[in-house]
Amino acid sequence: MNEFINFDEISRETWQNLYNTSIAPLTYDELESIRSLNDEISLQDVEDVYLPLIHLLRLYKKNLEDMSYSKGLFLQKIVKTPPLIIGISGSVAVGKSTTARLLQLLLSRAFPKLTVDLVTTDGFLYTTDDLKNMGILDRKGFPESYDMEKLTSFLYHVKNGERFEVPIYSHETYDILPNQSQIIDSPDILIVEGINVLQNPQNQLLYISDFYDFSIYVDADEKLIEKWYLERFDSLLKLAKYDQTNFYHQFTKMPEDKVLNLARETWARVNRVNLREYIEPTRNRAEIILHKSENHHIDKIYLKKF
């Protein structure tokens, strides 16, 4: 069976003609400031791919507002429009973070009077100490290493317009930062980015996917993702070379061939397994799939039919 049977496959050329605009509403420097390590993105990508996507999100937001108004008429009371929640998923090193930050910037420009917040699910990882106590430190990144109950609670509070403090994760220390949090307080639009965004925990009355009004999966061939992962690992080592507080600094003392073997082993033992067993199987839950080819070039878009 065709795994994309429930999607319309749209070429980049067709997609870019669905919404015509003269210029991207951001500068090259702004785009560079939100680009993730080893990701590649251009102003042409913004115009060809992301501006039509923003236009589509406008339609989803309008639909959410119309539905809230209609419910209010039916219930004969004022029903406040809940925040539009957008989920972004995909493998490590595929470019989710760049997509999330770019959408936050573009949505802020498209809706200048609205609050657009961004949260990564890394903040819902258990701390390193907790993972050690649970005996699952070697499973970090897998579903059981996340506090899914807390993530679900967060989404519930946001949908109900309530304030919530989200833990902050540091890739430099490879752990949750103690006594630090990101405050999310009644945003109009919330973007949630992470590998587990579309995963549903077992035995829950509420599923994470229940809270999303729109979801995106950033996709690519597994071999390409592995290549990007190894390139990113190398870049992280270079950044950590003179920073002894950085988690990756410990690897800078090792011979290059051993470090490369370690990165390949980590990919094969952790990230590839996680991708095949837990991340990629959630792909078809997304409303839209952004497919990447070489150099992070988005060549195809899959839009869910129904």
Curated annotation (Swiss-Prot):
It catalyses: (R)-pantothenate + ATP = (R)-4'-phosphopantothenate + ADP + H(+). It is found in: Cytoplasm. It is an enzyme of class 2 (transferase). Its EC number is 2.7.1.33. GO terms for molecular function: ATP binding; pantothenate kinase activity. Pathway: Cofactor biosynthesis; coenzyme A biosynthesis; CoA from (R)-pantothenate: step 1/5. Pfam families: PRK (PF00485). One of its GO terms (cellular component) is cytoplasm. The keyword ATP-binding applies. It comes from the Bacteria. ATP binds at residues 90-97. Keywords: ATP-binding, Coenzyme A biosynthesis, Cytoplasm, Kinase, Nucleotide-binding, Transferase. One of its GO terms (biological process) is coenzyme A biosynthetic process. Belongs to the prokaryotic pantothenate kinase family. NCBIfam families: panK_bact (TIGR00554). This is Pantothenate kinase. The lineage of its organism: Bacteria, Bacillati, Bacillota, Bacilli, Lactobacillales. The gene is coaA.
